[in-house]
Amino acid sequence: MTQQSTTVNALPVYVGAGQINAIVPSNAPLGRVSVRVTYNGVAGNSSPANVVSSSFGIITVNGAGFGPGIIQNYATAGLAVNSTQATAQPGQVEILWGTGLGPVAQDNVPPTVGNLPVKVEVFVGGQPASLLYSGRSSCCSGIDQINFAVPAGAPGGCYVPVVVRVGGSVVSNTATMAIDPNGAPCTDAANSLGAMFRAGGRLGAALLRHEDDQMTVAGATQSFSADSAALSLRQEAGGVWAFNPYVSLPPVGTCTAYGVAGVFPTLSDLPGIAATVKDLNGGASVSLTGPSGTASLAQTGTPPAVYAGLLATSQNLSGIPLSFFVNGASNALSGTGGADVGAFTASITASAEPTWTNSASAATVTRSAGFTVTWTNAPAGANVVSIIGFNVDPANNVSGGFQCLANPAAGSFTVPALALANVPATPAGLAVVRGWISVGAAQLASPVTFTATGLDKGIAIFGSSSQQTVVFQ
């Protein structure tokens, strides 16, 4: 690692053909440095990196920096890793594992136990936790542990967000933990999808969606609407740490967040999502019939495990109608069946999106301040309002987003600065603004269910949302 005339050597802990894990030495210069690997006397290319005094990273089960964290319940001699079955209770002491609290006196000797001289804050479900220890672990070089007590006001749930802030301003990645007031296996009353995914098996999931969009291109705002549908038929492994951003959702009243290296335009593209065991063949034909007619969903993949289609758009595209869904009307999703999944049908009712009443004020969002979303006219059948944001920074090769769930009856929700910390700022001079925020509603507690030979469970959801491009500052 080099900065001008100063060069220090990182401390390798693992070296493989395609990966090197190393500890940044405590005497590394702060600021912009170049990193170069030398092997058998041959130096590779230099890559830029930014070194700061403290920047904590929570270690997660999937190794990707999101989802269930490596957090131990300090309850028994075994110190079970927190999971949807081994939950924590409010007031219980937890041990959180990570790296990046800051430098120590010497890197080449066993770590000294003791708090490191940096301000550390832990937030569980948005609530501040009592800190008991924050320093090096005595087990390993470069590994830090933070001992904290679960706040009394922390919400119960299977994917309660956990965030660490150091030095008063540097926010970690967001991990999750499972909390139950009685230490029983966790439940998510507002979201049945997570339990289905954890149970695993042969699953069918359909999403019918209406969205109203506003997009800024070269300073001009374009508005359009779109109706779409998608169905996936897959065998999932499940498990107590299974995590998928689309179904492993935070408790109502909280937010989870994602920040990763790379340009990933949607949550489904994030690395670290559990791999599907098997794609299931549902046959050649899946269709959707409503008041506006019948549309076919195109197959994707081999075997055809995913069926998707743009049903309508106001953009006047050739061969695609202007609208498909009618609020309050039923739509029949039907499949003829195939080698793995038999014939099925499901009836789903369309509904309008909430009215996002302060959308104009969200055209620019200051990440350090957070922002409040207000709405009216949430659909009567919805049990959650979902607020999602995402942004990419191609120049710095980073992506980040957040998702919050709110009570539809509340009419407002404040997305905290902690949830926005890992959303990259919008680069100046972009012709097309790539950041966006969506405000929508759905019924996740009691979705429509359907059955078919070869499926353990099938669910169908109608979601409606308003989405607009946003400049994140």
Could you describe each region identified by the protein language model?
Residues M1-K278, S368-T374, P379-A395, G400, ...:
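A sequence-level detector for low-complexity, Ser/Thr- and acidic-rich stretches
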Residues S5-V15, P128-S138, G283-S285, T289-T313, ...:
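Solvent-exposed serine/threonine-rich low-complexity stretches and specific carbohydrate-binding patches
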Residues Q19-S26, Q145-P151, L311-I320, A410-N422:
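Exposed aromatic-hydrophobic patches
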Residues N391, N396-A428:
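Active-site/pore-lining binding-face segments in mid-to-C-terminal subdomains
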